[in-house]
């Protein structure tokens, strides 16, 4: 009888401790969640040309120049550097780029076009370890002004496959076409 009670007690303690060990502690929602944009943008079209995955920081009353300093390489988003995947060879800002996945960095400028960089480095946290010798291309991102302030950093591809990056009142555009179709 004592052995049965002891066995049941050991079983109960084991069961209780095993449920505590296996209980998952999920993290809170990231304040700068990841987002993605693709072209074509319709989820019904599976034959994509390009997709970009990036973190979406928010202004929250802060100045864009403090979050993405002028004349310094920026991760183009929050947390990890943005990554862009081309499923086909493209012409990115006038320069041919082979199909593949690249980190997307930018160098903001206050009064001029931004520099947009595709790098072979991948799975990179921020721009802390950016190396210019890993650049595939550097192109000019044309600047325009948004009438409405854009609170969360955003990227999209318009109907012409132009990459648009917007934050605060700044919109940076880089043309993309399929390689061989630039005629």
Regions found by a protein language model. Give the residues of each.
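Bacterial Sec-dependent N-terminal signal peptides
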Residues: 1-26
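Short capping micro-motif at the N-terminus of alpha-helices
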Residues: 6, 52, 99-100, 174
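Residue-level signal for beta-strand positions within conserved beta-sheet cores that form or flank
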Residues: 19, 112, 135
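Short, charged N-terminal helix-start/capping segments
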Residues: 19-39, 86-90, 95-100
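A broad, low-specificity signal marking well-ordered, structured residues that form hydrophobic/aromatic
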Residues: 21, 50, 82-84, 116, ...
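Primarily secretory-pathway and cell-envelope proteins
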Residues: 24-75, 124-183
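Mid-length scaffold segments of soluble, non-membrane domains
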Residues: 74-124
């Amino acid at each position: 009888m004592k052995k049965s009670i002891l066995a049941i007690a050991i079983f109960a303690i084991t069961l209780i401790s095993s449920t505590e060990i296996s209980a998952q502690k999920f993290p809170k929602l990231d304040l700068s969640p990841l987002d993605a944009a693709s072209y074509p943008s319709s989820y019904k079209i599976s034959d994509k040309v390009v997709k970009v995955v990036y973190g979406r920081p928010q202004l929250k009353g802060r100045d864009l120049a403090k979050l993405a300093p002028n004349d310094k390489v920026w991760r183009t988003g929050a947390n990890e550097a943005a990554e862009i995947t081309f499923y086909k060879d493209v012409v990115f800002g006038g320069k041919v780029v082979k199909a593949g996945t690249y980190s997307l960095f930018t160098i903001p400028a206050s009064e001029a076009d931004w520099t947009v960089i595709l790098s072979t480095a991948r799975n990179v946290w921020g721009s802390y370890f950016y190396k210019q010798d890993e650049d595939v291309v550097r192109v000019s991102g044309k600047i325009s002004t948004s009438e409405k302030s854009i609170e969360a950093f955003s990227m999209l591809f318009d109907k012409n496959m132009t990459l648009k990056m917007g934050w605060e009142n700044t919109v940076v555009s880089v043309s993309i076409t399929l390689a061989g179709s630039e005629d």
